């Protein structure tokens, strides 16, 4: 019989291998030669596991390797290596000669970055795979034999379980193996199937197909190598040497077949007899085993009873210990309580004495309190009078403050809510160097009058609220504007803006320089000073925002990215206007305000033209929000101050701008014109005020109308070169103020008239373009009027609701008056109750005195009772001591019982060991007798076979006998292997086929030499007989399964395994299969 060879490179467990095996090919334990004994141990189990691992491979030369590819495993015979789904960059950089993954049909690519355990020197191979039902076609190969290696790794279902991915691998449309990677090596571990032999025909094609059984197949790499040439062993022929002439006599095939048939029949008879004996011995062993199990069960029962008794004894010990501890704790508590009560009695005596002293003191204090009650009533009355005076003063102060605000704002209104101040700058260095003439007359500046020489000594005069000469400084200018600041703190909206042509000093007036501050800085400074003066009565919260209107677009100058979002004007529910998303900086002092102003001025849009190199091309607007809360009455106000530095207003012809600058100038002039229209409509109290004609006026809507106050600085130039712009600025200011003084009539200059006509024509052209925009605005106005009508309807409905609410308020007011009358009556009744309570207080004082006397008597009685309790507790302690003595006697008795039980347990253990030793000796003797009988029978069978069936060998020499027996035994062993041995591996099958092929070749050669024709096929009737004679297999192993018969075998016989059992170390249960009526030993 051939020995089973197991590869050491496949250390897999039995559970993982059995899941990979096909249900048609179950696994069995291995059986060695007939003369070898089978023993139970770790080595036999490991051999079985390895054999089951290799049973999944059809090719006996192939093997499974649970580690990755290494440099030492590389060979020069590699023809092609394909990394399935691999990255081209890793493929080119690797040491392997890896081909591109272009030979597949179907499937998907999957890659992972997880580390692969034991991946060898090329771990990237197992980090990519092809998944799905697919195939590979390797073409352009030379005919011959090749070796294919498959690289697998489970990188998808890393948490299992076993059997979640099972698939078949077909090579040249023949099933090679059935895989479950996770059950063999687990997740993120490589598994290699190497040395799979494949034959390439003339078409030069190898087709590898992957087909899923459960889940999708997965492969990481395919390696194709040249197959080494296998040397064919020489076949030996069967001959017999003669004793006399030493010639080799060939045995004919027919005679050899007859000899084998006879030996086969005799061996079958002997095997039947041995199988009967074997069944008889197994029955005896089964009975012995049943008796052993019953003895073990009795022993277990005794042990259980013994354990219960030991547990009861231990529980009794624990209860006794716990009770003893309880007694000790009770005695300790008694001693502690005794000490505690002694100390408590002493403390009570001390407290009684202290209470007596306190009682005397309280009685004295009670007399003093009774005497001091009239004085307390007088003091309460005085305090109430002071509180009422304080409340009257607060009310008068709030009324006086409101009147002061009204008077102050009335004075400001008498001066005009819309006030216009005119300021003229001095001549600059360029104008003085060219000796430019001054056209402004400041003779009536104190009265607010101003004269402008227009030409031909004609003079045009204007009147404003205040006129500043070039000699007036920033302090003089702010002195007239400072009253407006107080109005902001009183809750009014104020707007201060500077208007004029480019280069007239608007920015200087509003912002100034660090050495000479402007209106903006001085206004905020005064806001903080007044707020600091009023901090005891009013709290203020001031926030600042800086923005600009550039080309009719609002830009936030404090935002980090001004152009990132578009800002729009929204109207809130209370009617005020605000810009959502605008940055508001909360400021606490003037330094923070200056930093905010500097940041806004640096971000402002500036451009150059013919008039000024640094002309402001946008309207810079500083918004100051003031929130005030009156700490006296809780009134809250919210006001807004706008400080606006308007862009330069100049004529387009003079600036000579084009492109983007022309668009900027047109937008500036349009917004300034809209501002003039709004202010003029406010001054004339027009029914419609066009706030929405420009973003500038729309922003200033809250600070231009209603109770708001407006101050305008008109900036002019004294130079004769700027006379037209100066007149246009003064006309605009006069239009704003609503007062225009007629000019002194003198001789008219015709040249000037012609210039004016040309300007009129240009104005007409501009007006045409404006008319178109006006039409669009009218359409928008009509739409707004439709919306206003809807709002009017809603307003009417709200008015009706207000009337209903007023009626409800009247009814509630009447009810409150009635409740007030009821409350007055209740107050009178409460006064009467207070007088009654005073009388009750006196009565309670008398009762207190009586209670003190009774309590002192009761305390004395309690002290006596406590002394009696102490005496009783001393008596109870004696009783507890007697109980402790009784418990100690019981403990001694229980200890004696426990010693008796221990002695009985020892006796039982000695008896149990004696019985076990006797039974083990009997079983060993029986097993040895069975082994001796089997050996004798085997020797007897061999002697009978040699003497009866081969008489011609008796006269041969020893060498001839050896050769003859070798040849005959070779055939007999083949027959026995075909009939008696269970195959457990595909390797044994292939080796069996090789031996059969060699026999057939020898027969053919002998037939060709002798010229005789023989029928080498087996008789089908014999096969049927052999199958009928064979009994069902009886296998004594860990797992019992049916097996697939080998291709060359006709029947199978059972094989018994002998095992040595150590009863002292382990207990083996007995299992009976009642349906098949077989008795089987299983571990």
Swiss-Prot record:
Coiled-coil parts of chain: 264-418, 746-876, 905-947
GO biological process, one term: microtubule-based movement
Biased composition (Basic and acidic residues): 1020-1032, 1062-1083
Record PANTHER family: KINESIN-LIKE PROTEIN KIN-14R, KINESIN-LIKE PROTEIN KLP-3
Gene Ontology molecular functions: ATP binding; microtubule binding; microtubule motor activity
Keywords: ATP-binding, Coiled coil, Microtubule, Motor protein, Nucleotide-binding
CDD domains xrefs: KISc_C_terminal
GO CC field: microtubule; nucleus
Family: Belongs to the TRAFAC class myosin-kinesin ATPase superfamily. Kinesin family. KIN-14 subfamily.
Binding-site positions, ATP: 500-507
Chain's gene name: KIN14R
Annotated stretches, region: Disordered: 967-1083
InterPro entries per UniProt: Kinesin-like_fam (IPR027640), Kinesin_motor_CS (IPR019821), Kinesin_motor_dom (IPR001752), Kinesin_motor_dom_sf (IPR036961), Malectin_dom (IPR021720), P-loop_NTPase (IPR027417)
Entry superkingdom: Eukaryota
Name used for this protein in its record: Kinesin-like protein KIN-14R
Domain Kinesin motor as annotated: residue spans: 417-739
Regions of compositional bias (Polar residues) in chain numbering: 971-985, 1044-1054
Keyword hit for ATP-binding: yes
């Amino acid at each position: 019989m051939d020995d089973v060879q197991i590869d050491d490179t496949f250390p897999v467990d039995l559970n993982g291998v059995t899941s990979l095996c096909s249900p048609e090919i179950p696994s069995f334990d291995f059986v060695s030669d007939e003369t070898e004994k089978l023993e139970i141990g770790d080595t036999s189990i490991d051999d079985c596991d390895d054999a089951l691992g290799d049973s999944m491979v059809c090719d006996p030369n192939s093997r499974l390797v649970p580690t990755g590819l290494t440099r030492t495993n590389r060979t020069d015979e590699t023809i092609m290596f394909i990394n399935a789904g691999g990255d081209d960059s890793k493929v080119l950089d690797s040491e392997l000669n890896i081909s591109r993954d272009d030979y597949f049909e179907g499937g998907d690519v999957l890659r992972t970055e997880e580390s692969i355990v034991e991946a060898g020197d090329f771990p990237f191979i197992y980090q990519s795979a092809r998944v799905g039902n697919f195939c590979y076609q390797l073409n352009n190969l030379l005919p011959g034999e090749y070796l294919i290696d498959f690289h697998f790794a489970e990188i998808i279902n890393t948490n299992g379980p076993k059997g979640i991915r099972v698939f078949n691998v077909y090579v040249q449309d023949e099933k090679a193996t059935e895989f479950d990677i996770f059950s063999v090596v687990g997740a993120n571990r490589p598994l290699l199937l190497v040395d799979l032999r494949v034959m390439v025909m003339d078409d030069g094609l190898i087709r590898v197909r992957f087909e899923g059984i459960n889940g999708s197949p997965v492969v990481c790499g395919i390696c194709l190598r040249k197959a080494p040439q296998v040397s064919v062993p020489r076949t030996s022929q069967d001959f017999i040497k003669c004793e006399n002439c030493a010639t080799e006599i060939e045995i004919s095939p027919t005679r050899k077949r007859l000899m084998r048939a006879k030996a086969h029949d005799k061996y079958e008879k002997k095997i039947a007899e041995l199988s009967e004996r074997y069944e008889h011995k197994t029955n005896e062993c089964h009975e012995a085993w049943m008796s052993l199990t019953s003895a073990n069960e009795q022993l277990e029962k005794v042990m259980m009873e013994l354990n219960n008794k030991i547990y009861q004894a231990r529980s009794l010990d624990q209860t006794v210990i716990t009770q003893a501890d309880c007694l000790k704790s009770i005695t300790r508590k008694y001693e502690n309580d005794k000490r505690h009560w002694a100390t408590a009695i002493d403390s009570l005596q001390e407290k009684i004495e202290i209470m007596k002293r306190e009682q005397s003191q309280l009685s004295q204090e009670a007399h003093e309190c009774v005497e001091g009650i009239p004085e307390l009533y007088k003091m309460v009355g005085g305090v109430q009078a002071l509180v009422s005076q304080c409340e009257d003063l607060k009310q008068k102060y709030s009324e006086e403050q409101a009147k002061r605000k009204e008077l102050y704002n009335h004075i400001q209104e008498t001066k005009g809510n819309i006030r216009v101040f005119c300021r003229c700058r001095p001549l600059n260095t360029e104008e003085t160097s060219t000796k430019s003439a001054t056209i402004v007359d400041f003779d009536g500046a104190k009265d607010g009058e101003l004269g402008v020489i227009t030409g031909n000594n004609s003079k045009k005069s204007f009147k404003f609220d205040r006129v500043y000469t070039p000699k007036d400084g920033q302090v003089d200018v702010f002195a007239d504007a400072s009253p407006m600041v107080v109005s902001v703190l009183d809750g009014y909206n104020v707007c201060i803006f500077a208007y004029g042509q480019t280069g007239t000093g608007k920015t200087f007036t509003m912002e100034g320089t660090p050495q000479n501050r402007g209106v903006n800085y001085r206004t905020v400074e005064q806001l903080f000073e007044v707020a600091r003066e009023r901090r005891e009565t009013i709290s203020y919260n001031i926030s600042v925002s800086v923005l600009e209107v550039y080309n009719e677009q609002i830009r936030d100058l404090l935002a980090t990215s001004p152009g990132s979002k578009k800002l729009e004007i929204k109207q809130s529910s209370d009617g005020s206007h605000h810009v959502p998303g605008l940055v508001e900086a909360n400021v606490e002092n003037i330094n923070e305000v200056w930093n905010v102003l500097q940041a806004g001025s640096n971000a402002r849009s500036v451009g150059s033209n013919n008039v000024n190199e640094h002309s402001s091309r946008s309207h810079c607007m500083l918004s100051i929000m003031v929130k005030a809360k009156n700490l006296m009455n809780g009134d809250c106000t919210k006001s807004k101050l706008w400080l606006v530095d308007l862009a330069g207003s100049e004529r387009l012809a003079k600036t000579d701008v084009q492109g983007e600058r022309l668009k900027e100038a047109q937008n500036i002039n349009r917004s300034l014109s809209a501002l003039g229209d709004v202010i003029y409509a406010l001054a004339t109290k027009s029914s419609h005020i066009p706030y929405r004609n420009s973003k500038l006026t729309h922003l200033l809507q809250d600070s231009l109308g209603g109770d708001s106050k407006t101050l305008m600085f008109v900036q002019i130039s004294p130079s004769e070169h700027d006379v037209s712009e100066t007149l246009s600025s003064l006309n605009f200011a006069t239009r704003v103020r609503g007062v225009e003084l007629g000019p002194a009539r003198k001789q008219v200059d015709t040249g000037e008239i012609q210039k004016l006509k040309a300007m009129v024509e240009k104005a007409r052209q501009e007006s045409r373009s404006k008319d178109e925009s006006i039409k669009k605005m009218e359409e928008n106005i009509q739409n707004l009027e439709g919306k206003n009508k809807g709002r009017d309807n809603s307003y009417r409905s709200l008015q009706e609701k207000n009337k209903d609410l007023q009626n409800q308020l009247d009814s509630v007011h009447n009810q409150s008056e009635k409740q007030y009358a009821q409350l007055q009556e209740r107050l009178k009744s409460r006064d009467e109750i207070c007088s009654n309570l005073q009388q009750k207080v006196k009565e309670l004082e008398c009762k207190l005195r009586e209670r003190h006397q009774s309590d002192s008597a009761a305390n004395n009685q309690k002290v006596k009772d406590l002394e009696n309790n102490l005496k009783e507790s001393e008596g109870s302690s004696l009783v507890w001591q007697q109980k402790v003595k009784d418990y100690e006697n019981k403990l001694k008795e229980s200890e004696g019982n426990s010693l008796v039980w221990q002695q009985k347990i020892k006796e039982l253990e000695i008896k149990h060991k004696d019985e076990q030793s006797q039974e083990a000796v009997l079983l060993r003797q029986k097993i040895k007798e069975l082994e001796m009988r089997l050996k004798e029978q085997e020797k007897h069978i061999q002697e009978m076979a040699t003497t009866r069936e081969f008489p011609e060998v008796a006269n041969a020499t020893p060498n001839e006998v050896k050769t003859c027996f070798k040849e005959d035994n070779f055939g007999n062993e083949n027959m026995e292997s075909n009939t008696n041995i269970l195959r457990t591996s595909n390797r044994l099958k292939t080796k069996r086929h090789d031996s059969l092929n060699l026999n057939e070749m020898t027969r053919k050669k002998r037939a060709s030499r002798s010229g005789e024709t023989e029928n080498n096929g087996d008789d089908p009737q014999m096969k049927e007989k052999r199958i009928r004679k064979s009994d069902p297999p009886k296998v004594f192993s860990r797992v019992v399964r049916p097996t697939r018969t080998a291709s060359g075998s006709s029947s199978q016989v059972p094989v018994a395994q002998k095992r040595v059992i150590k009863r002292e170390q382990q207990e083996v249960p007995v299992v009976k299969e009642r349906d098949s009526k077989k008795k089987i030993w299983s571990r």
